[in-house]
Structure formats: structure tokens, C-alpha cells
Swiss-Prot record:
Family from the record: Belongs to the RNase PH family.
Keyword Disulfide bond: no
Role description: Phosphorolytic 3'-5' exoribonuclease that plays an important role in tRNA 3'-end maturation. Removes nucleotide residues following the 3'-CCA terminus of tRNAs; can also add nucleotides to the ends of RNA molecules by using nucleoside diphosphates as substrates, but this may not be physiologically important. Probably plays a role in initiation of 16S rRNA degradation (leading to ribosome degradation) during starvation.
Protein name: Ribonuclease PH
EC number: 2.7.7.56
Entry keyword annotation includes rRNA processing: yes
Domain of life of the source: Bacteria
Alphabetic keyword roster: Nucleotidyltransferase, RNA-binding, rRNA processing, Transferase, tRNA processing, tRNA-binding
Length: 238
């Protein structure tokens, strides 16, 4: 039995609140149960130095957690003067995931930065960030299209969503919350496109190694869950 009472293949309630920020070109408050992340997309008319005069743009991401996003207050990383390894890993994952469905040539020599700020954490912050970041990116591109800068359908090739799966109490489960994640035997994150293409899989056995059969089950759970998330994205932008 899962602590939340959910079935093994049941995700938490997911919601998207678009245009949460009045300043950003695109923004979305995404909620996966009690995990809440604010995703904002900011447009700059410049590219990183290595892309100058290439005709290509860039999509990148930054990730952070508010000090009291968790049970006990965390020290701000800015106060220590450097980002932690986990933060760097997650923000690179978000950027890679989004770029997988963006035609950088069609974007032109511009940069879109997605900021993912975790307001409240209860497991799955990176997967919620990726899923919400796609909405923020979409709205940023729609903002650009309204000013005749780009055509969204040429720049954005597909949806991107992500979900966690793992083995908890010897059962393969989807969308782990903190209680499950902190004691899971196996923890994995899946990032996939709307068409079912695999962008990234991160999987770790926390205790006992997992079998190929168990991995296949997790993959099946993730595929179904991501299809559900993509459908929710489509409903949100309709």
C-alpha cells in the first residue's frame, strides 16, 4: 500500500496555471500533488558567445528551491556563493529536455531562459519542472509569434513531459512523493516526447539491484504516465 493510498499506476493530481507571472514572456505554476514549481520563460535578443553569427538560438534553464520549500529551512545557494551539484545536474537536464523538441535554427539568434523555482517540494521536483517548463516555453513562443518574430509550429516540434517511477515496498509505482522516494528500492526519472521518443532515462538502485523485467515495468508505467501528462498539456494550452 502506498502512503498516499494511490494505486501503483496512479499519478498525483497535476495542474497547470498559465500566465502566473505578469512580467515573463511565458510562465506556468505547475503542481504535481504537493510539489509546486513556478516556471518562467524569459526572452533575450542575444545568444551565447559560441553561437554568435550561427543563425541559431538557444534554450537553457536554471533551477532552484526556496529555502522553506522543504520540511526544514535550507540555506540559499546564493548565500554560499555557489550552486550545488544536484542543482547543476537538474537545470542541465531541464535545458537538454526542452532543446530536444526545439528547432534552434527557426528560433533565430535569441536565447530563452527557463527559470524553475520550487515553491514547495514533495518529491519529483525535476519531473514537474520539465513538464511545466514546456508550458512556459510554449507561451513564450506564442508571445513571440504574436509579434511576428517566429512561427510556433516551426520552432516547437513536439511536447516534452517527465515522470518519476520506482520500486517502493517491492512494487513498481509511478510518480513517487517524498515519503516513497526517500525509502524507494529503485528510483528512475523518464523524459519523453509527445510522440513517445525517449529523451533521457535516469535510474538508480538504492539498495537491491533491479531486474530487466522490473525496468520494463517501470518503462511501461512511465510511458502511460507521460502520455497522460501530454494530454493535460494539450488541454492547458487549448
Amino acid at each position: 500500500m502506498r502512503p498516499s493510498g494511490r494505486k501503483t499506476d496512479q499519478m498525483r493530481k497535476v495542474s497547470f496555471e498559465r500566465n502566473f507571472s505578469k512580467h515573463a514572456e511565458g510562465s506556468c505554476l505547475v503542481k504535481f500533488g504537493d510539489t509546486h514549481v513556478l516556471c518562467t520563460a524569459s526572452l533575450e535578443e542575444k545568444t551565447p558567445p559560441w553561437l554568435r553569427n550561427s543563425g541559431k538560438g538557444w534554450v537553457t534553464a536554471e533551477y532552484g528551491m526556496l529555502p522553506r520549500a522543504t520540511g526544514e529551512r535550507m540555506k540559499r545557494e546564493a548565500a554560499s556563493g555557489k550552486q550545488g551539484g544536484r542543482t547543476q545536474e537538474i537545470q542541465r537536464l531541464i535545458g537538454r529536455s526542452l532543446r530536444a523538441v526545439v528547432d534552434l535554427k527557426e528560433l533565430g539568434e535569441r536565447q530563452i531562459t527557463i527559470d524553475c523555482d520550487v515553491i514547495q517540494a514533495d518529491g519529483g521536483t525535476r519531473t514537474a519542472s520539465i513538464t511545466g517548463a514546456w508550458i512556459a516555453l510554449y507561451d513564450c513562443l506564442k508571445w513571440m509569434e504574436s509579434r511576428n518574430m517566429i512561427k510556433v509550429e516551426r520552432v516547437l516540434k513536439d511536447h516534452i513531459a517527465a515522470i518519476s517511477c520506482g520500486i517502493f515496498a517491492s512494487q513498481p509505482v509511478i510518480d513517487l512523493d517524498y515519503l516513497e522516494d526517500s525509502s524507494a528500492e529503485t528510483d528512475a526519472n523518464f523524459v519523453m516526447t509527445g510522440k513517445g521518443g525517449i529523451v533521457e532515462i535516469q535510474g538508480t538502485a538504492e539498495g537491491t539491484p533491479f531486474s530487466e523485467e522490473e525496468f520494463t515495468t517501470l518503462m511501461h508505467l512511465a510511458k502511460n504516465g507521460i502520455a497522460e501528462l501530454v494530454e493535460l498539456q494539450k488541454q492547458a494550452i487549448a
